[in-house]
Structure formats: C-alpha cells, structure tokens
C-alpha cells in the first residue's frame, strides 16, 4: 500500500479530514477578515489619496503639496513592490510545498543569469527613480528667492516664541514696511570680559566677549512675544512669498508647522555653526488657523512650546499690521480684522490664555 493510500485509509477519528477541512475554512475566513478590516479603514478616508497619504496633512503651500505627492508616490511604489514580493512568497508557499512523495530537490535558480540580472538591476532602477523625484522636490522646498514679500524673524527660547516683521514689500506696491530695530540689536552687544587677577586679558567664548553676547538675534518694531499667559499668534498673508529667519536664544529648537510639511532646526548663532537658518514658502494658499510646535526636545516644558499661524487675506494683513504700528496689542489687532484674539488650534492646552486685559 502506498503512503497516499495509507493516508486515505485513516479513519476520521485520527483527524485527517478535519485538519484539511479546517485549513480550507480558515483561509477564506482570514481573507474575508483582512478585506473587511481594509474596507473599514479606507471607508474613513475621503479619497484614495487620503488613504495613501497615511495621515499626512494636505498642506497649505505649493512646496507642501509637492512633498505630499512625493510621499504618496513612494507609498504606491512600496505597495507595488510589496505586493509582488509577498505575492511570490505566498504563491511559492501555497503551490510549491514539498509533498510526501517528493524525493528530489526542486529546480534551482542559483545560476540563472537573466534572472539574476533582473533581480539586481530592478532595485537600482527603483532607487534611481525615487532619488530623482526626491532631489527635484527637495530643491524646490529649499529654494531661496530674492526679495521675498514678507520677512519674519522667528526667535525661539525656553519655552516659547517671539515673532517679528523684519520687512514687508508687496510686489503690487500696496504695502512697504521696514520693521527692523537696529538699536535694540546693538544693545545686545556684550563687553569684553576684562582682565583677571594677574592682569591678563580674559578670553570669552564669543570673539573674546562674554557669553551673554546675542548680536546674532534680530529685533523688530512689531513683535509678538509668547509667554506663560500668551500663546503667540503669527499673522501671515495669503498669496505672498514669505521668508522665515530663525534663531535661538538658548538651546536647539525646531520650527514646525505640520501644514507646511517642513520643519527646520532653530540653532543658536547658526552662521557661526555653519547651519542654514532661513527658509521660504512660495505662498500660503489657504486662509485659516494652523498649529505650530517645537519639534526638538528642549527641556522641561518642551511639550507646551506651541504657537499658531493665522493666515488672512492681504488686505486684512495690511489692516492688522497698521493696527500693530499704531501701538495696538496682537489680540486687539486681530479683533480689529474680525479674527479671534487668541489661539484656536493649540488644544489640549488652554487656548484662552493670551486674552490681554485690553481685549477681555
């Protein structure tokens, strides 16, 4: 009697048929469960693009849209490669398992030159395509154009933010403003450390000066300063190229607005440390309120180092800036253009802090 005939002669009590029947039932059941879970997950997405973005924000700048499209393209490429690889693994496991009657090794492909070439060249082609599109998007995101229409000074400190308008120059000529405050900047220059008890000159850490030298920081006439009582709101116009000049007054921070799909480290004295401290957005194409964070662990209250970007129309921005130049507080200027005077996107933190006495 052959082994197959012996197997068929086993009674049901030995479990031959139940095992096979169980496997036949479990496979379709597992497939149905997988498809059901996938359907539930995808049903919560408004489109395939949202599903493939895997939680990425939609973005409010042209650079953000390019970055999101690059991410979605990489996800699609990964899914295609994964489907092929896992499909082949499943196919080999399901249809080419060793049988009880097999006595020889299956056909080997160790010296199949065409197959080896395909398996070697294909990954390099995939990497090359992804590398090309990554470089293209990166160049557009890091591009610094001459004469941006709005220049914002961003100063990070433990554990809050200061925003100032260094320069505003709309190309249509409707608003020109120079907001730099050089006198306050000069006041940050420290004096040499002098001589020690032996009459020798003390050499400081910064060009022979003491470490309180902060001449790399920028100061402006119109500023919004965050504090324990105020979550700072940075007001920006739509449709204008905006430059952010970043500096830290103490430790390393990171300026991150998730809807920009971009973040950059904020470093003390960045130029002396050969670090890039400027980036631009081509324009912001969606008005609204957008939360911002520090994305670099910077100490005890790092998690509360939030801010808000409030995007308004160019006309509202001009009215807001005029209010600030007239001496109004940030909250009062926001109220004057019909905006909430306090942050509305910094949940779960108290968004009502910052309601200044004059606007309560």
UniProtKB/Swiss-Prot annotation:
Residues 1-39 form the signal peptide. Cu cation binds at residues 253, 294, 298, 302. GO terms for biological process: ATP synthesis coupled electron transport. GO terms for cellular component: plasma membrane. PROSITE patterns: COX2 (PS00078), COX2_CUA (PS50857). Keywords: Cell membrane, Copper, Electron transport, Membrane, Metal-binding, Respiratory chain, Signal, Translocase, Transmembrane, Transmembrane helix, Transport. It is an enzyme of class 7 (translocase). It comes from the Bacteria. Pfam families: COX2 (PF00116). Its main location: membrane. GO terms for molecular function: copper ion binding; cytochrome-c oxidase activity. Its EC number is 7.1.1.9. Binds a copper A center. Gene3D superfamilies: 1.10.287.90, Cupredoxins - blue copper proteins. The chain crosses the membrane at residues 70-90, 117-137. Subunits I and II form the functional core of the enzyme complex. Electrons originating in cytochrome c are transferred via heme a and Cu(A) to the binuclear center formed by heme a3 and Cu(B). This is Probable cytochrome c oxidase subunit 2. The gene is ctaC.
